[in-house]
Amino acid sequence: ANGQQMQRFGSYDLGAQNLQALAAADWRLAPGWTLLGSVQWSHLTRDAQRRSSAAQLNQDWSFATPKIGLNWAATPTTRLWANLSRSHEAPTFWEIVSATVAPNSPATAQAELVRLKMQRATTIELGGAGRWGEGAHAVHWTAAVYRSVLADELISTTDANGIKVGTYNYAGGTRHQGVELGLSGSQRVGTGALDVRASWTYSDFRFRGGEYAGNQIAGVPRQLINAEVLYRMGAWRFGPHVRWMPVSTPTDHANTPGAEQDAYGLLGRKLEWRDGPLALYVQADNVTDRRY
């Protein structure tokens, strides 16, 4: 509070390396049907050395991520697909270097290095994309449903003040599943056109076992809706956009009653100028000054 410099408590030299190799192939099984397969091999390293001592933590992971998919061109304007894949996610330095800073006692701040496993997942996805109509005023749509079963998910925790406490691998297993829908199009109105874009996501992310078995993973909105309606005249577009979270979201993994983030809706405005690949815009979010 008096402007004096605090002690340095987390000074590290960090080094990362990513090596990857990919092989992919596709086979046309029949008119409109294509089978796709790929496998990616990765080797990642994350090294951290504390500058003020000999403390260090060097970690590396090697893994393969296969994927197989089937595409069907149902019509000239409609494509459907099914995918089965494995994925891996290595921890970041933000998760490996864990800092503890008490708001009412910053002089006791400290940092430590945390050894973490890779997060692994198996995912199945069904989806489709297409359009209704032709030309510049066609309506485009996308839809997908997915389910992922995860092991050793990287879970972050915070204290009652919202300060990050740390990250660890959740041993009880987790599950991510949901639905994603998107719609976009343009319709002529007067001397210009009305560009519409909307998306809806439904996310059911839960702990499968362990301490929080059955609970919703904190901070992941169960439903989220984004939409914008922009009127276009020449190179200019302007109009409103909306971000709406229609249901409350838990803020802790224990799903404590009364500790949820309440549902909210935010209204914004956007002004955009576009000329070929160049675009400039001014955007104002939450123009109604809603607290959320």
Residue ranges and their predicted role:
Residues 5-12, 47-57, 109-115, 164-171, ...:
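Extracellular loop and loop/strand-boundary signature of outer-membrane beta-barrel proteins
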Residues 17-23, 64-70, 80, 112, ...:
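Hydrophobic, lipid-facing positions within transmembrane beta-strands of outer-membrane proteins
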Residues 73, 79-85, 95, 115-179, ...:
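Membrane-embedded beta-barrel scaffold of Gram-negative outer-membrane proteins
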Residues 11-17, 58-63, 115-120, 171-177, ...:
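Short sequence motifs at beta-strands and strand-loop junctions characteristic
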Residues 25-28, 62, 70-74, 86, ...:
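Residue-level signature of outer-membrane beta-barrel architecture
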